[in-house]
UniProtKB/Swiss-Prot annotation:
Keywords: Cytoplasm, Protein biosynthesis. InterPro entries: Ribosome_recyc_fac, Ribosome_recyc_fac_dom, RRF_sf. It is found in: Cytoplasm. Responsible for the release of ribosomes from messenger RNA at the termination of protein biosynthesis. May increase the efficiency of translation by recycling ribosomes from one round of translation to another. Residues 135-159 are annotated as: Disordered. One of its GO terms (biological process) is cytoplasmic translational termination. This is Ribosome-recycling factor.
């Protein structure tokens, strides 16, 4: 019974970590990452479609993203969608593809992104703590229903806290690693 509670808690915490890693991909570091365009949606024959489903998106070098649409008629639509997404660059089109040139990041931009990384880490910790609360509530419910003893309940809550501490430490390590990457010039 308690093992089910622990498994559910670990699953919830893993989801929080996965969400944090996904959020980190939206932060720009020294080199461009094509995942910055993951949220860009294109009006493709009346339905909103992710950019990567209508074009090939590649990082040409450390500061350039090249977008080659599968249909040349989509170039104007893609350029408009990128401008509307407000990612901090203007698209340049040569008739064949759309290129995005990212200027080098300033120290202020790097520090701002490091702050965002910290805030994302705090949000993930809140998620982990909410999962802990749910797990503790489940342990207390088992005790109330006489499925486990008071001692087992106490041990169960201690184990829930150990699991939480482990995941909070993982989040702290991920945030520290991301901050170092962001602040590295």
């Amino acid at each position: 019974m308690l093992n089910d509670v622990y498994a559910a808690q670990k699953d919830g915490c893993e989801k929080a970590i996965a969400s944090l890693k996904r959020d980190f991909t939206t932060l720009r570091t020294g080199k461009v990452n094509i995942s910055i365009l993951d949220h860009v949606m294109i009006d493709y024959y009346g339905s909103m479609t992710p950019l990567n489903q209508v074009a090939t998106v590649l990082a040409s070098d450390a500061s350039t993203i090249s977008i080659t649409p599968w249909e040349k008629s989509m170039i104007k639509t893609i350029s408009g969608a990128i401008q509307a997404a407000n990612i901090g660059v203007n698209p340049n089109s040569d008739g064949e593809c759309v290129k995005l040139f990212f200027p080098p990041m300033t120290i202020e931009q790097r520090q701002e992104n490091a702050k965002h990384a910290k805030a994302m880490g705090e949000k993930a910790k809140v998620s982990v703590r909410n999962v802990r609360k749910d797990a503790n509530d489940e342990v207390k419910k088992l005790e109330k229903d006489k499925a486990i003893t008071e001692d087992e309940s106490k041990k169960g809550q201690d184990e829930v806290q150990k699991i939480t501490d482990g995941y909070v430490a993982k989040i702290d390590a991920l945030v520290k690693e991301k901050e170092a990457e962001l602040l590295k010039v």
